[in-house]
């Protein structure tokens, strides 16, 4: 119940709503189904609220499971104090749990491990206790592994460095100070790898971590990955050292070395990794949310129903690919013309005549021009032709993903006899007629909805974009007699196999006119119905 209360407080929903959503999900109901058909039970929660409840439940469950594991492991070691147990139980992030667990994790053999095994722990304690004449005291701890006083003191320092670097309170202090006061920086590493100088503004860049914007984080990550940039940090090291020294009474000089090593060799690198991870997670979440919103708007563009459309896939050298589709999206014909340079004048003139012939023969009402290579030149060509053809207009269509679709198994199945370029022209025409029906055939990541879509977690991006597609399809609805398997598969309760069976049933039995007929589709049981 504590988990439910956290979800309720965070999301502003009731305990009953949370219980209903999670119960329905456990029973196999999908988010679109719950949002559309269980409004009474959920109190009219929409898809976004339902998904937020499910996601937060997963996150809190993972956190609780990890706490349970960590507590059990520390208890096995006999080192679980009431204070430590409470700290772990109160931790709100996985990263905080890992910080508390760090001193108790099984480690590979370190210099500190070897020093402890050689019995140097008491000498380390003497450093902390400001032992007078430490060098003479160290003579009592010499061994084969640490044969000199210098070696023994160095070993004792290693023990303290590891202990301080793993102290949860000091690590939290360091983390908070870095979050507030440190800068993230970047400098030029190899200009030859940035021919177009895409990353020029990051050649000499610095920004407070607290003010870092998501798109800058993703840009630094990409520049670093490509070998163009070197990313680093500037820390208030002196300020941190003063904080640390205030925690220790020892003034023998060795403690300064301990603190310096603990910070520079252990804590700062660890905190930098943590903060880079956190900045990236925040940036990814923001980018994915933006990509999802862009995709949603794209899918919800109003369809242009009942019009004969000519799809125009522009190109320079290889010629423009044309495809005419009827009012239902059925392909009528395809053609290749050479309307722009480097085509010769005679080829361009022939292209004009061919375009006019197609418009007249198939009663084309609107031309959809792809916005890719040679789009401007093609637009000028089409505009010139349409001066001689009344009542026909053109529109520029976002062709992102059309080439991906044209080379896909689905496109090969739809148009096995056509080249990929002609399939692409058909896709451009159809996405003007019905953007949703056509775009669902394409992997959402290929539709071109965001600048950094290849720099974020592909798993999280796919899940988010797939959720948007499912939500929009179920919001808009589909025509069971015309929808493709790709579109049907996003309907709540249906999958790829059932969707293909629906289309096959249509082809064999004709138009579906009643709900009773739907139940006759193979594999479409009462639960899916």
Ranges and model annotations:
Residues 3, 36, 62-79, 89, ...:
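Long, highly charged, low-complexity intrinsically disordered interaction regions
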Residues 26-28, 116, 233-235, 314-316, ...:
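Flexible glycine-/small-residue-rich
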Residues 29-47:
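Feature marking long nucleic-acid-engaging regions of large polymerase/nuclease enzymes
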Residues 1-19, 26:
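Generic start-of-chain signal for non-secretory N-termini
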Residues 308-325, 351, 355, 484, ...:
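Extended, hydrophobic alpha-helical segments in both membrane/secreted and soluble proteins
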Residues 24, 37, 73, 163, ...:
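Generic, well-ordered alpha-helical scaffold segments in large soluble proteins
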Residues 49-52, 59, 63-311, 315-417, ...:
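Duplex nucleic acid-engaging cores and interfaces of nucleic-acid transaction enzymes
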């Amino acid at each position: 119940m504590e988990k439910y209360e956290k979800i309720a407080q965070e999301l502003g929903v009731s305990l009953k709503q949370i219980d209903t959503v999670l119960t329905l999900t456990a029973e196999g109901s999908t988010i679109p189904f719950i949002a559309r058909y269980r409004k009474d039970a959920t109190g009219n929660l929409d898809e976004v609220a339902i998904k937020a409840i499910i996601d937060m439940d997963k996150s809190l469950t993972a956190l609780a499971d990890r706490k349970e594991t960590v507590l059990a492991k520390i208890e096995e070691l006999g080192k679980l104090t009431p204070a430590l147990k409470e700290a772990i139980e109160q931790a709100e992030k996985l990263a905080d749990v890992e910080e508390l667990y760090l001193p108790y994790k099984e480690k590979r053999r370190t210099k500190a491990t070897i020093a402890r095994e050689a019995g140097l722990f008491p000498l380390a304690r003497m450093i902390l206790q400001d032992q007078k004449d430490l060098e003479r005291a160290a003579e009592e701890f010499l061994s084969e592994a640490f044969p000199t006083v210098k070696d023994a003191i160095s070993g004792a320092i290693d023990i303290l460095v590891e202990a301080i670097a793993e102290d949860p309170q000091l690590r939290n202090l360091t983390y908070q100070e870095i979050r507030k006061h440190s800068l993230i920086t970047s400098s030029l590493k190899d200009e030859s790898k940035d021919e177009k100088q895409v990353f020029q503004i990051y050649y000499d860049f610095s920004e407070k971590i607290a003010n870092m914007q998501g798109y800058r984080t993703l840009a630094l990550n990409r520049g670093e990955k490509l070998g163009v940039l070197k990313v680093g940090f500037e820390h208030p090291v002196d300020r941190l050292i003063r904080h640390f020294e205030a925690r220790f009474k020892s003034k023998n000089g060795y403690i300064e070395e301990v603190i310096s090593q603990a910070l520079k060799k252990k804590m700062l690198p660890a905190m930098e990794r943590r903060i880079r991870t956190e900045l990236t997670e925040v940036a990814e979440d923001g980018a994915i949310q933006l990509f999802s919103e862009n995709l949603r708007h794209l899918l919800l563009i109003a369809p242009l129903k009942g019009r004969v459309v000519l799809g125009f896939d522009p190109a320079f050298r290889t010629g423009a690919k044309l495809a005419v589709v009827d009012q239902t999206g059925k392909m009528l014909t395809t053609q290749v013309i050479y309307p722009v340079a480097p085509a010769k004048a005679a080829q361009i003139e022939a292209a004009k005549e061919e375009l006019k012939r197609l418009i007249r023969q198939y009663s084309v009402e609107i031309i959809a021009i792809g916005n890719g290579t040679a789009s401007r030149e093609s637009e000028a060509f089409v505009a010139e032709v349409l001066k001689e053809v009344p009542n026909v207009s053109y529109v520029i269509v976002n062709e992102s993903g059309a080439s991906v679709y044209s080379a896909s198994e689905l496109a090969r199945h739809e148009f096995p006899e056509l080249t990929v370029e002609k399939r692409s022209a058909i896709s451009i025409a159809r996405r003007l007629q019905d953007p949703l029906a056509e775009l669902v055939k394409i992997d959402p990541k290929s539709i071109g909805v965001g600048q950094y879509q290849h720099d974020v977690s592909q798993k999280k991006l796919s899940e988010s974009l797939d959720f948007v597609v499912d939500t929009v399809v179920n919001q808009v609805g589909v025509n069971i007699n015309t929808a493709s398997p790709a579109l049907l598969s996003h309907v709540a309760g249906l999958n790829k196999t059932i969707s293909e069976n629906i289309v096959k049933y249509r082809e064999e039995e004709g138009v579906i006119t009643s709900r009773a007929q739907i139940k006759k589709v193979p594999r479409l049981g009462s639960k899916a119905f």
